[in-house]
Amino acid sequence: MKIIRKDFVRNGPGSVKMMAEDSDDLWYTYNLIGPEDSVMAITFRKVGGEGRDSTPSLSRIESKYLGKKRSFTRTERVKLKLEVQVEEVDYDKDGDVMRIRGKNIMENEHVRIGAFHTLEIELKRPFLLRKENWDSLALDTLKQASDLAASADLAVVLMQEGLAQIFLAGKSVKSCGARIKTSIPWKHGAGTAGYESVLKKFFENVVQAFLKHVDFSVVRCAVIASPGFTKDQFHRHLLLEAERRQLRPILENKSRFILVHTNSGYKHSLSEVLHDPNVMNMIKDTKAAKEVKALNDFFTMFSNDPNRACYGPKHVEVAHERMAIQTLLIIDGLFRNSDVKTRKKYVDFVESVKDSGGEVFIFSSMHASGEQLAQHTGIAAILRFPLPDLEDIEM
C-alpha cells in the first residue's frame, strides 16, 4: 500500500490518502473501511440534461394538438470527485475492485448532497479515507498494509491431471493467479501418443501461467502440489523447459521449489499445502505461517488438554475475565460488523487481551486457516491454565 499523506491522531479523528498497489492492499482496505467512515475518490457518474425539445410526459398525439414538441433526455458519463458516507462495502477479489456505497456529502454540480453513489476503488487509484476514530485495530491494519516486506510469500501450483490453479499467498489474501483446464484422454493402447501430446500441451500452458504470475523477487517459495505423480511430472517438465529455453527465473530459483502431496487439485487442498512441514519451514517467519501454527497449536491443545482451549464468544469472554487467555485467535469478519458497537466491542476485547499479556492473531476470512477458524465460530483461545467449568456455560 502506498501511503500518500496521513493526518490523524491515535484514538481520534483524521484522514489518510492512499493507493492500493496489489490485491492484498485492497483486502486490507476492505478491512479498514467501516460504517460512519467517509471515502473521497475520483469517480464516474451518468448525468442527464434536457434536449431542445420539451416535456417528455406528453404523447405524440397530445403534442400535436397542444402544439408542443416532445422532449428527450441526453445522458453522459462525467468524471468527478465525490465523498460518500460509507454504508456498504463490497470486495470483488477476482476483479480486484472494491465498491463503496453511501450518500454523497460533498457539494457537486452533478450530484446533490444525500444522493446515493457507489465509488469503485481499483489498483493504482488514490483515495482519501476519513475516520472519526483511528483505533488500534485500524492503525495495525494500516501498518501491515504499508509493510513492503510482507508481500506475497508463497506461490502454489495446485494441480491434478487436466486441472491446474495458481495461488499467491500474501499478507492475508490467497488470490488465484490462473486456472488451466484441459480434457486429458485415457492413456491406453493406441491412445498413448495422444495422451502424451495433450499432457505436454497442458503442462506448457501451466508453465506460461507460472511465468506470468510468479515473481521470485517477492515470492520466497514455490509449491507444486497434487495427488499422485502429476506434481513430479510437471516439475520435471518445468526444469527441462527452463534448461531448453534458458528461463532464468526458473533456473536461478530451482532450490525454492517444493513438491507436496495433496488429496486433490482443488482449492480446499490449500490447507494441506500450508500445513506441510517443509513449506512451514520456508515461510516460518511470515504472518500466514504464524497463523497456521497458532491454529495447529489450538487444535492440538483442544485434543490433548481440552480444559486449556475454548472457542465461541461467550466461553472466550469468560476465559478473559479470569485472565486465562494465552493466545487469542479471531477472524477479521467480526470487525466488519455493520453495528459499530459490535465492532468496537471486538476491538476493545483484542486490546484488553494484549494489555493482559496475551498474544493475538487476526485471521483473514479468505485464508484456508481463516476458513477453518470460521467453522469454530471465528473466535478461539489457548489458555494459560485449565478452566474445566467452561463446558457448563452455554455458548
UniProtKB/Swiss-Prot annotation:
Component of the Pelota-HBS1L complex, a complex that recognizes stalled ribosomes and triggers the No-Go Decay (NGD) pathway. In the Pelota-HBS1L complex, pelo recognizes ribosomes stalled at the 3' end of an mRNA and engages stalled ribosomes by destabilizing mRNA in the mRNA channel. Following ribosome-binding, the Pelota-HBS1L complex promotes the disassembly of stalled ribosomes, followed by degradation of damaged mRNAs as part of the NGD pathway. GO terms for cellular component: cytoplasm; nucleus. Its cofactor is a divalent metal cation. Keywords: Cytoplasm, Metal-binding, Nucleus. InterPro entries: eFR1_2_sf, eRF1_1_Pelota, eRF1_2, eRF1_3, Pelota/DOM34_N, Ribosomal_eL30-like_sf, Transl-rel_pelota. GO terms for molecular function: metal ion binding. It comes from the Eukaryota. This is Protein PELOTA 2. The keyword Metal-binding applies.
